[in-house]
Curated annotation (Swiss-Prot):
Reaction it catalyzes: L-seryl-[protein] + ATP = O-phospho-L-seryl-[protein] + ADP + H(+); L-threonyl-[protein] + ATP = O-phospho-L-threonyl-[protein] + ADP + H(+)
Gene name as annotated: PSKR2
Residues linked to a glycan: 36, 45, 142, 165, 205, 251, 254, 278, 313, 323, 385, 403, 421, 483, 504, 523, 549, 571
Membrane topology: Single-pass membrane protein
TM spans (from-to): 680-700
UniProt keywords, alphabetically: ATP-binding, Cell membrane, Glycoprotein, Kinase, Leucine-rich repeat, Membrane, Nucleotide-binding, Phosphoprotein, Receptor, Repeat, Serine/threonine-protein kinase, Signal, Transferase, Transmembrane, Transmembrane helix
Biological role: Phytosulfokine receptor with a serine/threonine-protein kinase activity.
InterPro entries: Kinase-like_dom_sf, Leu-rich_rpt, Leu-rich_rpt_typical-subtyp, LRR_dom_sf, LRR_N_plant-typ, Plant_LRR-RLKs, Prot_kinase_dom, Protein_kinase_ATP_BS
Chain positions found as Phosphothreonine: 751
Single Gene Ontology MF annotation: protein serine/threonine kinase activity
PROSITE patterns linked to this entry: LRR, PROTEIN_KINASE_ATP, PROTEIN_KINASE_DOM, PROTEIN_KINASE_ST
EC numbers, comma separated: 2.7.11.1
Descriptive protein name: Phytosulfokine receptor 2
Amino acid sequence: MVIILLLVFFVGSSVSQPCHPNDLSALRELAGALKNKSVTESWLNGSRCCEWDGVFCEGSDVSGRVTKLVLPEKGLEGVISKSLGELTELRVLDLSRNQLKGEVPAEISKLEQLQVLDLSHNLLSGSVLGVVSGLKLIQSLNISSNSLSGKLSDVGVFPGLVMLNVSNNLFEGEIHPELCSSSGGIQVLDLSMNRLVGNLDGLYNCSKSIQQLHIDSNRLTGQLPDYLYSIRELEQLSLSGNYLSGELSKNLSNLSGLKSLLISENRFSDVIPDVFGNLTQLEHLDVSSNKFSGRFPPSLSQCSKLRVLDLRNNSLSGSINLNFTGFTDLCVLDLASNHFSGPLPDSLGHCPKMKILSLAKNEFRGKIPDTFKNLQSLLFLSLSNNSFVDFSETMNVLQHCRNLSTLILSKNFIGEEIPNNVTGFDNLAILALGNCGLRGQIPSWLLNCKKLEVLDLSWNHFYGTIPHWIGKMESLFYIDFSNNTLTGAIPVAITELKNLIRLNGTASQMTDSSGIPLYVKRNKSSNGLPYNQVSRFPPSIYLNNNRLNGTILPEIGRLKELHMLDLSRNNFTGTIPDSISGLDNLEVLDLSYNHLYGSIPLSFQSLTFLSRFSVAYNRLTGAIPSGGQFYSFPHSSFEGNLGLCRAIDSPCDVLMSNMLNPKGSSRRNNNGGKFGRSSIVVLTISLAIGITLLLSVILLRISRKDVDDRINDVDEETISGVSKALGPSKIVLFHSCGCKDLSVEELLKSTNNFSQANIIGCGGFGLVYKANFPDGSKAAVKRLSGDCGQMEREFQAEVEALSRAEHKNLVSLQGYCKHGNDRLLIYSFMENGSLDYWLHERVDGNMTLIWDVRLKIAQGAARGLAYLHKVCEPNVIHRDVKSSNILLDEKFEAHLADFGLARLLRPYDTHVTTDLVGTLGYIPPEYSQSLIATCRGDVYSFGVVLLELVTGRRPVEVCKGKSCRDLVSRVFQMKAEKREAELIDTTIRENVNERTVLEMLEIACKCIDHEPRRRPLIEEVVTWLEDLPMESVQQQ
């Protein structure tokens, strides 16, 4: 009702009359500051402004005054002009849902007649202190969904205020009592999605009039105050996403007008009071993700107007003794992740509007009620992780739910036979039958599910071959047949799946507004990765842990959309098809534990998004590819292949050195290499041959030593000859370089002519070599791997611009070198390598990375990034913030590396691809929709680094046993379950104040917000990190 009353101000039409000269001038100045000419072009011609789009006037026929300016959703860009303050008769100002930026001009406070102000959903920033304080007649103030900051008290107090919405901003501080005491009639108050702290006591004066109270997604603590239960006019109460605790009082029954109660994601405990008999107007109840226990409140049956009932993720137990027949409007019922038991009530099938029903992870048993046939509106059904029986009858019942698009039945019907006579399911997009132990062959009735996109049959006892008709399932793009007993070859038809060749982008009808995640599990014990809609599933084929044989089809290269391919633990033979290198989106490739032979295609170096790769335990030979991501894969990815050699180890470097030293005993070296690869067969050979092999080993070692000596003896004359052959060379040293007279030949010699032994790092832009100069100083030389794509003058200008970025927390660029076709960048040397090395590779790293050191690293890296974003001229977006680009000096001070390199290289030659910028695990979600890197994207990536410091985990873990998932998803799930403390790295947990670490975790979560506009600026992150205490708790 209050919203309707306020909208009365907007009713009216433009008056055909000239407007006041002051108003005309102010509007023209406003138009000059805006960029959407389609709206403001007409404003610049003529003087009859009362006829202009969005302008409303009142007054005399001679000169009307502008009283309403209404321009919502007009695509306006630019800033709000100070001239608005000259429209002194303005009563309504609505510029909402545009793209206005900058600060709100203080001149708005001159609009003493203003009653409605709506600047919501823009890009406004800065403080509002003193900006709107002069609006004495204001009744409706909406500045939500911007980036406004400061204390909540900065907004001011207004005696006639009816509605105040400051949600989705950056306001801080406590809720001050004056907010309501100055206005006795405030009815709508929305403070949600800010950074407010303290308790709810400051709202005591609102209790007389408030109808809608929203304070969700802040940092509030304490219990619900008693006055809250006495607001009899209250219709909507939303407190979700805070740290509120205690129990709900039985006085909740006093709120008889309540329509919506949302208190999810807090720390409430004890039982849910059974007082709903007096809350008959209730339409939406969400108490999910708390610590409630006890029984299902029976009095809920009297809330006949309920549309949404969400009790998930608590510790509720017992059977559901509730008659659902009266819930004629119930659309969403979520009881997942509790301890409910017993059979499902038949009455549950008498909810005609039910669209979403989630009963997963409980202890329900028995059969699915036959009444479920009546759920004709049902879209989403999850019954996983229970003890339901009679799969055949279940499908017979559910086939009548003709709108069903998502069906998750995992971990039920243990050991039953798969039926062959199923019909219906015409709209099914997701079918999950994993971990059921079902027996039989893959049923042909699946072909009737024309819209099926995701099919999970993993961890069952399916046998026989993969059917050829699977290629006819045009919508299918996610297949998991892993952990069965399937046999035969992979059918060519699987490479004809249209949605894996080219994703059509038509996601199913699955509702993502419910907030109910689907969890994709890759093994029996993992919690899985959440995907809230079908389009978020990664296109995948999992056929691992079966008995499949034959060769890997070269036609698999057709599946350009494929992200995950796991064929491990089968009986495949033959070679690895080179066509796989054409799968540009591939993130996971696992071919381990098969019988493959031949070599790893060198073209695999082009798979720049590959984060997990394994060919372990096959019969492969030859060199392991040495470019791209391959330096980052662990030894375990290649073990069990005695014929493989790695380019940075022997014998591959020996083969290379023989090319440089043709006079060396290459024949002995090659023979030795063959011996090393075939030595396993000596187990049954005679003693005489064994002695011969032993002598060969001795010769091999002598040969390798001889070659190594030759490499170390490469002289200046040889390097000079190579330089001349490559063409003209040039070296430019900046003032920061300590070696002023360095020549190109000396630079090459300092790296042993880019010897493998001098490699100290590998990134998306190329290898990094350690340079040892004659005077004892060191440098890091980056050999850019991409085509620079620029004229020499442009390249030099870009590099010199980067050299001017000088800050103590940046790796300083000391010079560059052009040598033939190579571009070399000379950086200061960091003694302690990268943060990634200390966190994830060095065995004793955690002994050094105590909490104080981690915090110092986070602070330093944040300061370096803030310099790039705000101080450096021109401003620099890093595009690839990650732990391996944070280098550490001898004092473990952080230095940000690789900034600005994306501008030096052609995008198709580096990690900065035409599809995404950055490195897997650090890439912001919005980059999948846009090719434009932003400062907010850098903040997301930095937030992932903070998660690494808190948890000690990689952003995308190499699978270990049965726990494989990405870090961001894990953090959000643990946070939702209020288990944040379990995320803290166990190596620091005992020696640090837990609250301090959790504060850093909270900062990280702000940085990785899915919505870019809600992420903080990096300078805000710097401030928050510097406020964290350094002292670690000493061990007792």
